[in-house]
Amino acid sequence: RTRCCALIKSKNKNVLIDTSPDLKQQLIKNKINNIDKVFYTHHHADQTHGINELRFFYLKNRKKIDIYTNNLTKKYLLNSFGYCFKKNREYPPILQNNSLKKKHSYKDNGKIISLKSIKVEHGNIDSICYVINNKLAYASDVSKIHKKDLKSLNNLKYLVIDCLQYNYHPSHYCLTDILLLIKNIKPKKTILTNLASSIDYNHIKKKLPKNVIPAYDLSLIH
């Protein structure tokens, strides 16, 4: 399976969460012809190193793409991919960095799409869980959600959440953690993402409650 990222697709806008190293393949397979914005969860390579694939959309539209990052991710991207942000003789800047706020929203076809950002722990760094229209939460890399933030995750329609492996890991939720979490916040459906290659899709599916499913490449949520 490819490294995880997500696309929020509305009628006229495509908004990415993260730029995985497999982004080009993911965009082609999903027939995505434009990207309007990118929101990052954190700075690790498996969520950022497809950033150069955004160049195609800049060249197509001749318009910088807005990205939204926390401070650590901003620093990492500027240091590692400075040519995407600063003008030089060889490459035009393709991205405009923006500071991540607690709440963002944008309009498409008269409808407002809202994103709430919640800081979660991912081992010894912070990662971001995004809550979209108060219906879907996306937390691709998480080892702890703070108690004060659980109320923002109550009774969701969908919870898309990190499940690296069956047993304890210091930087990621495992299956035991998730089953305890969903008893507390009661999402209607939970989708497990960021699954390690050691987890077989059919094997884990047999172990899960009916309202919990493993994600797969090109998973769609309506």
For each of these PLM feature ranges, what is it?
Residues 16-20, 36-46, 69-70, 136-142, ...:
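Active-site neighborhood of phospho(di)ester-bond hydrolases with catalytic His/Asp-centered motifs
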Residues 33, 93, 111-113, 154, ...:
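Structured loop/turn residues at beta-strand edges in well-structured enzyme cores
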Residues 14-69, 155-157:
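Active-site metal-binding motif and surrounding structural segment of the metallo-beta-lactamase
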Residues 1-30, 96-148, 217-221:
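Core dinuclear metal-dependent hydrolase active-site scaffold
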Residues 30-32, 52-56, 81-84, 130-131, ...:
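Short, glycine/charged-enriched secondary-structure capping and boundary segments
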Residues 146-221:
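Binuclear metal-ion centers of metallo-dependent hydrolases, dominated by the metallo-beta-lactamase
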Residues 61-65, 73-97:
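Active-site neighborhood of divalent metal-dependent phosphoester bond hydrolases
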Residues 23, 46, 75, 167, ...:
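Glycine-rich nucleotide phosphate-binding loop and flanking beta-alpha elements
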